[in-house]
Amino acid sequence: MKLMQELAEIIPGKAYNDVKVMVAMSGGVDSSTVAAYLHRVGYKVIGVTLQLHNNFTSTQTNRKTCCAGSDIFDAKRVAAQFGFLHYVVNMEETFRKEVIENFAESYLKGETPVPCVKCNQTVKFRDLMKIAKSLSVDALATGHYVRRLTTTNGVELHKGIDPSKDQSYFLFNTTREQLEFLRFPLGNLKKSETRDLARKLSVDISEKPESQDICFVNGKSYADVIKKFRPDAQRPGKILSTDGEVLGTHNGTIHYTIGQRHGLQLSAPIPLYVVKIDAQNNIIIVGTRDKLQQRSLYVKEVNWLDRKELTAGLECEVKLRSGADTVKGYLYPNGELLKVSLAEEPKCAIAPGQACVMYHGSKVLGGGWIV
């Protein structure tokens, strides 16, 4: 099986029973299957689950978010079923400050944030790596659908082979040092194959549905989450046309995102879209679809993973949203920013706060945040 071939390379040249692996267990099918399989074939497995928000005591089973209270119990249940060590680490304070509050502040600035990237960058990789080192393990394995390939140029991050499950967009901020230590056993599998393996192993939660929502939103609107941290966030303001004409009013910029068409409550003979959010002046600017079209953008805080130097004019494929197709682009370093010139109009709106991830084929070259 392809999974076995991948697992066999966790630490090349070492017997399975001589390798200690920490598995980041979210309580879902994917990471539970990784932990169960590694344990079954002989690895010394330690499962670690992060308690990220204060619903730990909840045992609801119909939640469709990751890291819910019931997920922690599921992770503990799988560890008990297979007989390996499992720890729960309380990271609520860090998660609140670095993920939830960052999410709220980003929306207040008129951006459209991607909290899952921030979560992976901070508590799920940076802090899990510290825990792994403290436990003196040889590697940290996760249930992400990406691939880690060792080449003559070093370790590289690649897309998972299943396009519908590939999570490389959310992991662009992984560092080279982290990649040396991380393992992604599911990168060569389709989701259906993972679930089949879970059934074959008789994992208790093999039929558990996938998580779909942002974990801390939990059925609420994004605005509800933001208002919890900033009660003053919902201030009424003007909706203007691109020509400066007042078309209506809004009930807070936090309710809008670039490219949004529905919910504007405007009477117009043609469809109008949000083309700009001026959060500082509390103004929403709308226009026709062509006003969204642009062929260049700037990116900040670039994490460059490729071993080759980032030079002006480098050709690559660019992904501007997690569910969007890639578009051919050219990269031009510009001081602290990176200019990205696109060969064609992207099908999605370019929104500040979203991640821009660059690829060469399946390889992740790097990425950053759209400004």
UniProtKB/Swiss-Prot annotation:
Whether Disulfide bond counts among this entry's keywords is yes
Positions contributing to ATP binding:
24-31, 50, 143
Q: What is its main location?
A: cytoplasm
Give the source species. Neorickettsia sennetsu (strain ATCC VR-367 / Miyayama)
Q: Which reaction does it catalyse?
A: S-sulfanyl-L-cysteinyl-[protein] + uridine(34) in tRNA + AH2 + ATP = 2-thiouridine(34) in tRNA + L-cysteinyl-[protein] + A + AMP + diphosphate + H(+)
* Family label: Belongs to the MnmA/TRMU family.
Annotated site, Interaction with tRNA, chain positions:
144, 354
The entry's protein name is tRNA-specific 2-thiouridylase MnmA
Transmembrane segments in this chain: where? none
GO MF entry, a single one? tRNA-uridine 2-sulfurtransferase activity
Q: Where in the cell is it found?
A: Cytoplasm
Gene Ontology biological process: tRNA wobble position uridine thiolation
UniProt keyword terms in alphabetical order: ATP-binding, Cytoplasm, Disulfide bond, Nucleotide-binding, RNA-binding, Transferase, tRNA processing, tRNA-binding
* Single GO cellular component term: cytoplasm
Q: Gene3D superfamilies this protein is in? A: Adenine nucleotide alpha hydrolases-like domains, HUPs, Translation factors
Q: What EC number(s) does this enzyme carry?
A: 2.8.1.13
- A single Pfam family it belongs to is tRNA_Me_trans_C
What is the top-level taxon of the source organism? Bacteria
Query: Can you list the disulfide-bonded cysteine pairs?
Result: 119-215
What is the stated purpose of this protein?
A: Catalyzes the 2-thiolation of uridine at the wobble position (U34) of tRNA, leading to the formation of s(2)U34.
Q: Which residues form the active site?
A: 119 (nucleophile), 215 (cysteine persulfide intermediate)
Segment Interaction with tRNA: which positions?
Answer: 165-167
